[in-house]
Amino acid sequence: NIPEGQKVSLQCIWEENVYTSGSSTDYYKQTQATGTTYSLEEGVNLLKMQGPGQLFVMYNVDGEQLLNNPAPIKIHIPLGHGVVNGFFDLEEHKTDAKYAELISKATHKYFCVRGERMMFYFHHLKMLDAAPTEILSAIHLWDDIVGWEQSLMGISQYRQDGKINNHMFAISPEGSYMWASDYRMGFVYTYLKNILLRENVMAAEDN
């Protein structure tokens, strides 16, 4: 059931080309900041995806409604109408052992890790190479970094009060280096070993 007054949708996130010159062949790929959105209504929804990607559930409420602990929702996708890739949710899965199990079974190009404040959406194979068996040190570190930034911005109290629960979205572009925009953070996919494990992050000032 979709609670009255709430908005629920599916968003299909895939890739975009980033052109580095005037040539149509000189580009690299990176994850989109947003994707095609499919609004859901209570009952049966017949949807045809317009392209490939992973589906994210968007359950949007305003800050005041968050204080009332919005009711959970269930979305059922019939067998044969999608592929379960899996993702790691710190709140639900909790352990490095569960992370290792989930990422080893994943089949999609990208794998998602959701922390308290940070969400990694990185190349599956690069992530498997950089952090095959442990992720807690990485997600705790980046959750802390986002928390420090929000404290400096003066908005940490709103999260503590339960008025916001947005996540920072980190991707692994196939070009460029490191950057941040209004919508996401980029860590080039060849550098994930240096930013995923706490000891590697702390090993060099440039990480």
Q: Where in the sequence are the language-model features?
A:
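Short linear motifs at secondary-structure transitions and domain/linker junctions
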Residues: 30-35, 85-90, 94-98, 140-144
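Catalytic cores of extracellular degradative/oxidative enzymes
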Residues: 99-105, 109-207
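Low-complexity, Pro/Ser/Thr- and charge-rich linker/hinge segments at domain boundaries
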Residues: 74-112
